[in-house]
Amino acid sequence: MNQKLFSVRTGPLFLLAVLCCLLTFSSRLAGWDASTVHDRAGRDAFVGHHLTKTSPPPFAFIYGGKASTGVIGKWTVSSEERTEGPKLIRTVVYADPSTGLRVTAVYTIYKDFPAVEWVVRFKNTGRADSPIIEKVRACAVSFPGFPGTASASGPVMLYRARGSSAARSDFGPIDEPIAPKAEIRFGPVAGRSSDTNALPFFNVATSEGGVVAAIGWSGRWEAVVGRKGADPRSIDLTAGMAETRFKLLPGEEVRSPSIALLFWKSDDRMSGHNLFRRFVLAHHMPQTGGKPTPLPINHGVGFGGPFPCNEYVCATESYAIGMIERLHQFGIEPDACWIDAGWYENATGQWWSGVGTWTVNRKNFPRGLKPVTSAAKKLGQGFVVWFEPERVYEGTWLDREHKDWLTVLPGNANRLLDLGNPKALAWLTDHISNFIRDEGVTIYRQDFNFDPAPYWKAMDAPDRVGIAEMKHIEGLYKFWDALLDRNPGLLIDNCASGGRRIDLETTSRSIPLWRTDYQYYEPNGYQCHTYGLHFFLPASGTGNGDPRKYWFRSAMGGAVVMGWELTGSFNLQAAIEDVAEFRSLRAYLYGDYYPLTAYATGDDAW
């Protein structure tokens, strides 16, 4: 089966489609019993085979020219356990006494879901450079006797999705059979985790059950799913960074991508998808009071204006406050107001010209953004402010004052702020956190509009391939964690050219409120995006510029970003009804997801 929750155009039919989801959600498991879908036996067998002190680990690498499978068993091994709520956390440390390499695997075994996760850290505790560590695979496992393969009653299928490329086909589902002696290899096109080719979530399924896998890495990754072994009933899964070949300096430490596996059993693969969606809601989504944080209905408070205005370059304090008051005057009450790119100094001509100077343009906002955010706060509304901190444009403040923090490519005006540099990371964390506090920001919106992979490659020596990427990505996670810790209640909006950095780690810390840069407000494309992304992720947002019912309903995805111009031709009554309807239905979008029709991108399908 495939799904179009929002494919119908008429009100009653639409509500009927939503009610299908509503009834499932409201009874939590109407239609299927969770206990019959949880493959705890499969999960427990996996734990016994891989996640203990004495078992071969679920990861692999080559160390000093030798496969880890042949040497790690000779190292010193220790382990410890602790419990955190519904999680058993087991830490296993593998130490090479001859070189001082310490490999630490942190395994998380969930009690409330048939799921496991792990992440691996490498540290050189010796006094000399380590031997070369290469071809690191954070996941390198086989599933012998995979459910359904013995009976040959149906093929082994790989259900995955495209990433984002500002196209109607963004997040489109890809269903591929895995034939015996074959394998499927996939990953993003470059240095952002869900760029164009692949989303780092996938379901390996048969007619009896399967495993949903997720990769937590916000850079370059690669996964391979195959049946190339001698036993066609065995499924092989490897995943990790796209390229690694590095030595570690004395005292240096790096981490791998994180991996999650969820084991399910059913003759309907949607049971696996829905169980994974629930797992994400429970353990990998921002929480408020122990429940998934309600996503906001947003509205912009500035429009581009006549040439040469673009984005929010020409936005002003008076205009923004006037827009907030105008929305309130006409009964449109968003949860949060929104200022996008262009509010900062040096944003002359084009919005990107000031990226790297993160101070407010005092010509347009003489008192900073606080008067604007305060106007929203008086109405009970939060406030979204856009940043793109990893990109630094030539001539901006960071480019002038801290060139030592930047990586520059010849002939390219964009520089990369190195989040693996402790000084750069500390400055950025303090500066943005203080800005959030002082200016009254409640939703921090982070964009990332260029490919970092060439910069990381330029930073790496031949014997340090992957180091720049690993340190930058870990710096990103430290940055976001610090913002959340210092600003209780803060929500992070993960943009990255619209949905190009969605993975398990970013999903755990943020929400993509603007999931694609596909042509703004086009409803049929938005239907396609909802269709594909919701197989794995229950919460995302997109834009709406037209209050007509089909247009607005096509943008429903947990959050919505409105850009309505309240002029004489604007249908105010429809807009008020849209907001009220969305509020009444929003919770049900977190329910189970059941495809009603086949996936199609043509206009005639919608």
Where are these regions (language model features)?
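Active-site and adjacent substrate-binding regions of carbohydrate-active enzymes
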Residues: V120-F122, S374-A376, K423-L504
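Active-site-proximal substrate-binding groove within the catalytic cores of carbohydrate-active enzymes
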Residues: W32, L476-W606
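Aromatic-lined carbohydrate-binding/catalytic grooves of carbohydrate-active enzymes
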Residues: P294-S433, E439-I443, P452-Y455
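Short Pro-Gly-centered flexible turn/kink motifs
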Residues: F246-K265
